Amino acid sequence: MPEAYEHLRHPLLRRPVRDIASGTEGELMAVVYEEVGQVCGDPQYKPIAYIRMPSGRELSTAASNVQALG
């Protein structure tokens, strides 16, 4: 299991992608293993993807929501 806040390898890094949850398109900049909440006091971690839109702003989403464009 990855360490908390560790950057993860992803086959779509630096490629054009779409966030299927919001429809946002951009370049996948990073995937980071982050705390997303707690269950019975235990932290829960999930891979979070960061997509940079053409405007330069970044959006975070679940890594499972990332889809290749094209």
Regions inferred by a protein language model and the residue ranges of each:
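Basic/aromatic-rich interaction segments and small domains that mediate binding to polyanionic partners
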Residues: 2-70
